[in-house]
Amino acid sequence: MKDSKELKIMTVDDAVAQIEDNMVLGIGTGSTIELLIPKLAERIHKEQLNITGVCTSNKSAFIAKKLDINVVDINDVGHVDLAIDGADEVDVNINLIKGGGGALFREKVIDEMAHRFVVLADESKLVNYLGESFKLPVEVDKFNWFHIAKKIEAFDDIITERRMSDDVPFITDNGNYILDCQLNKQIDPYQFHEYLIHLTGVLETGYFLNITDQVIVGTQDGVKIINKSN
């Protein structure tokens, strides 16, 4: 039986094959993307492709630059042709929960800009509904994080935790906290997102709704492609 890393590796080649010369490419964040970036660099240099990368996190930018991928600031490009990223959950409508790596705001900016957004995932990420197995990350301002948490908990039997890293609060690339929200039952993601995004101090939620074009899934039986239904 293949482990999670092996399943992720299976998805990478299909994603790299979608790269074309002269693209502005959105490069995501997380363990799957860290497997993708070296393969991406290999193809760019082997075929001498002109690729401009915009990265969803400082970590991804560091890795890409180290492999001599041309990386620029998001404000230096007018569009993104293709964005490739991972996901923490994928539901039956290929809506997502993202943000396990703490980069959800920048991920959403780039993924929404992209003409085409492709997600890489192993089969363990496929769920019946969002929040079934992974906590929903919400990026919040440090100033009033505790009060935001209480308002989130008041919504509908939700448990929040401020994300920690090495016994100190995790800080995003934007200088904010992450609240991880445990949903104890199925909740309408559109309704909950609207509630959250209007709370003062909330920067963004980990719901990625109606923006995914394709999911490449690594399974024990091979690669499965799920395309957005028209």
Swiss-Prot record:
The reactions it catalyses are:
aldehydo-D-ribose 5-phosphate = D-ribulose 5-phosphate
Q: Which residues form the active site?
A: E107
A GO BP entry is: D-ribose metabolic process
| Binding annotation for substrate | T29, G30, S31, T32, D85, G86, A87, D88, K98, G99, G100, G101, K125
Sample GO molecular function, one term:
ribose-5-phosphate isomerase activity
Alphabetized, the UniProt keywords read: Isomerase
Q: What class of enzyme is it?
A: isomerase
Q: In which pathway does it act?
A: Carbohydrate degradation; pentose phosphate pathway; D-ribose 5-phosphate from D-ribulose 5-phosphate (non-oxidative stage): step 1/1
| Bridged cysteine pairs (disulfide) | none
Which SUPFAM superfamilies does the entry link to? D-ribose-5-phosphate isomerase (RpiA), lid domain, NagB/RpiA/CoA transferase-like
Pfam families noted in UniProt: Rib_5-P_isom_A
InterPro entries assigned: NagB/RpiA_transferase-like (IPR037171), Ribose5P_isomerase_typA_subgr (IPR020672), Ribose5P_isomerase_type_A (IPR004788)
The record's comment on protein family reads: Belongs to the ribose 5-phosphate isomerase family.
Q: What does this protein's UniProt record list under function? A: Catalyzes the reversible conversion of ribose-5-phosphate to ribulose 5-phosphate.
Q: What is annotated about its quaternary structure and interactions? A: Homodimer.
Protein name as it appears in the record: Ribose-5-phosphate isomerase A
Q: Which organism is it from?
A: Staphylococcus haemolyticus (strain JCSC1435)
